[in-house]
A protein has these predicted regions:
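N-terminal beta1-alpha1-beta2 submodule of the flavodoxin-like/Rossmannoid cofactor-binding fold
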Residues: 1-97, 160-173, 186-204
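Short acidic capping loops at alpha-helix termini that bridge into adjacent secondary structure
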Residues: 34-35, 106-108
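Mobile beta-alpha loop/short-helix "lid" or hinge segments that flank ligand
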Residues: 37-48, 101, 134-158
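Acidic/histidine-enriched, beta-strand-rich ligand/metal-binding domains
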Residues: 90, 103-104
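A glycine- and small-aliphatic-rich helix-loop capping segment at beta-alpha/alpha-beta transitions
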Residues: 94-102, 129-134
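Short, glycine-/small-residue-rich phosphate/pyrophosphate-handling segment
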Residues: 108-152, 167-170
Length: 204
């Protein structure tokens, strides 16, 4: 089972990417995935959507096809978003516009919101409300909000708040188990063929 983690921060060396790499290793260590991969939006590697995607533009195909294959080969996802001004970063919202060929469809995804303080709820609501319609990603009823992120999940234990760090490490294992179970279950749904339709390609 392969789980792909999407780190949605544009910043280099971001806290979101730190959490993504920690979670990728946690999934492996706890037998919740056999392979993981982190894809980071640091530095904006994906241009803003334009009609060239629909028209089969060669430059878009060269950029997206390798990533499309990795997404299609994944059984589930972890979507990590920092809270910027109470919002999901533009690059992460743009990410969801790029996949309309079933790469994400009917696959489970765990939302992980990242906050440097006590916030983090707004990205969860925004992603659940508006990022799934046409790509048909399936968000779990479980999510994580990693608050005061600078003080948890650091490799240097002296930088962690011991009690809070322990809580988030345990909660990540719990959520990873749910993601893994959903990934197994939804594989059967996709293989049944019931989700395939050339008539109803877009959500309502």
């Amino acid at each position: 089972m392969k789980i792909m983690l999407i780190s949605g921060s544009h910043r280099m060396n971001s806290q979101s990417e730190k959490v993504a790499h920690y979670m990728a290793q946690s999934l492996l260590d706890n037998g919740q995935a056999t392979a993981t991969e982190v894809f980071s939006l640091a530095g904006n590697p994906l241009p803003l959507w334009d009609e060239g995607i629909w028209n089969g533009d060669a430059a878009w195909q060269a950029l997206l096809n390798p990533l499309s294959e990795k997404l299609a080969a994944s059984d589930g996802f972890v979507i990590l978003s920092p809270e910027w001004h109470g919002q999901v970063p533009a690059g992460l919202k743009n990410f969801f516009l790029l996949w309309g060929s079933g790469e994400l469809a009917h696959k489970p995804a765990l939302i992980v919101s990242i906050s440097s303080s006590d916030g983090g709820a707004y990205p969860v609501a925004e992603l659940r409300m508006s990022s799934y319609k046409n790509n048909r990603i399936c968000y779990l009823p479980e999510h994580l909000i990693i608050r005061n992120v600078e003080s948890v999940l650091n490799a240097d234990a002296s930088k962690n708040n011991p009690e809070t760090d322990r809580y988030f490490r345990e909660r990540i294992v719990y959520a990873g188990g749910i993601l893994s179970a959903y990934a197994n279950a939804l594989k059967g749904v996709r293989e049944s063929g019931i989700t395939h339709s050339d008539v109803f390609r877009f959500g309502m």
